[in-house]
């Protein structure tokens, strides 16, 4: 019997801590779900190893909303690396090409924008028309989904254009991902050979320059910490963020948080995501 116990202990000692987490971050998530009367999906992943550090509903589907724009620009950069696209190429468009919330692209109807400028607008300002113009260059929603399949993401799917993709109907699988799939895809884009080192740096810099994520994790970030992120929002009870975080101004972990099916206001959704981020950071610093 003593031999059996020793074998069990030895076996347990070798098991990976793939989904282990302290109660504190998970307790905050449970509280957020209760206060939001909705669902929260979250994953915290080590950037270097891909190991999952914390997870909650990580394999459930959530609307991507504008977080898809990071993957979109990753697909654009893959085309640049392949010689099929140039960041300096100018794209011209018309008034009828503009959709709601296009704070950058609406100012350049006369002169157009380069592919690189459109990516910057899509990520840093979440410009919807910029995203649609870029989406057209990769073959539309079906083309972006095909890119995801090519890099090994068999879960994430884009079905519609801006702004319909933000509809976030309960139970609708269109335009969704899972926290685990989004984190794994982001890690592939930023650390594997899917993109050149130059394109990886460019994608990360666009996320660093995000100007519309202030009320979320950036609001609780300690001094000297690194963050690069992209948010998403829907009028129908959803919110999300994909981020890279780390102390000493270094990206060390990927954090993906999605909310759905909540009647809470946008301010409350922001507050809850910030609270989850704060709990993760506090646990990290222990």
Swiss-Prot record:
UniProt keywords (A-Z) are: Antibiotic resistance, Disulfide bond, Hydrolase, Plasmid, Signal
**Annotated positions binding substrate:** 230-232
Identify the catalytic residues.
66, 164
Name one molecular function that GO assigns to this entry.
beta-lactamase activity
Pfam families xref list: Beta-lactamase2
Identify the enzyme class.
hydrolase
Superkingdom is: Bacteria
The Gene Ontology biological process terms listed for this entry are: beta-lactam antibiotic catabolic process; response to antibiotic
The EC designation for this entry is: 3.5.2.6
- Signal peptide residues are 1-21
Q: Detail the disulphide connectivity of this chain as listed in its UniProt entry.
A: 73-119
Catalytic activity annotation: a beta-lactam + H2O = a substituted beta-amino acid
Which portions of this protein are annotated as coiled-coil regions?
A: none
Q: Which InterPro entries match?
A: Beta-lactam/transpept-like, Beta-lactam_cat, Beta-lactam_class-A, Beta-lactam_class-A_AS
What functional role does this protein have?
A: This enzyme hydrolyzes cefotaxime, ceftazidime and other broad spectrum cephalosporins.
State the NCBIfam families in the record.
bla_class_A (NF033103), SHV (NF000285), SHV_LEN_OKP (NF012143)
| Similarity field | Belongs to the class-A beta-lactamase family.
Misc. comment: The class A beta-lactamase family has a specific amino-acid numbering system, sometimes called Ambler or ABL numbering and often misspelt as Amber. A multiple sequence alignment was used to derive a consensus sequence and then the consensus was numbered taking into account insertions and deletions. This allows use of identical numbers, e.g. for active site residues, despite differences in protein length. UniProt always uses natural numbering of residues, hence there appear to be differences in numbering between this entry and some papers.
Official protein name in the record: Beta-lactamase SHV-2
What organism is the protein native to? Klebsiella pneumoniae
């Amino acid at each position: 019997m003593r031999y059996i116990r020793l074998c069990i202990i030895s076996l347990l000692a070798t098991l990976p801590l793939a989904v282990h987490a302290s109660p504190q971050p998970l307790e905050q998530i449970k509280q957020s779900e209760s206060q939001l009367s909705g669902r929260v999906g979250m994953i915290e992943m080590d950037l270097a190893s891909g190991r999952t550090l914390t997870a909650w509903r990580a394999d459930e589907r959530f609307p991507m909303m504008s977080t898809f724009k990071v993957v979109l620009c990753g697909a654009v950069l893959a085309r640049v690396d392949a010689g099929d696209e140039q960041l300096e190429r100018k794209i011209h468009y018309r008034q009828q090409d503009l959709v709601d919330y296009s704070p950058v692209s609406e100012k350049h109807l006369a002169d157009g924008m380069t592919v690189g400028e459109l990516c910057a607008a899509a990520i840093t300002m979440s410009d919807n028309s910029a995203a649609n113009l870029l989406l057209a260059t990769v073959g539309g929603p079906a083309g972006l989904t095909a890119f995801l399949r090519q890099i090994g993401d068999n879960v994430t799917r884009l079905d519609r254009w801006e702004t319909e993709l933000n509809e976030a109907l309960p139970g609708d699988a269109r335009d969704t991902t899972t926290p685990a799939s989004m984190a794994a895809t982001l890690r592939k884009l930023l650390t594997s050979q899917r993109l050149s080192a130059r394109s990886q740096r460019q994608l990360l810099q666009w996320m660093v320059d995000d100007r519309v994520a202030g009320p979320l994790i950036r609001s609780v970030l300690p001094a000297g910490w690194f963050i690069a992120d992209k948010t998403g929002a829907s009028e129908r009870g959803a919110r999300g963020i994909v981020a890279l975080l780390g102390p000493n101004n270094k990206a060390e972990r990927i954090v993906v948080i999605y909310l759905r099916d909540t009647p809470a206001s946008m301010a409350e959704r922001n507050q809850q995501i910030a609270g989850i981020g704060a709990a993760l950071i506090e646990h990290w610093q222990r």
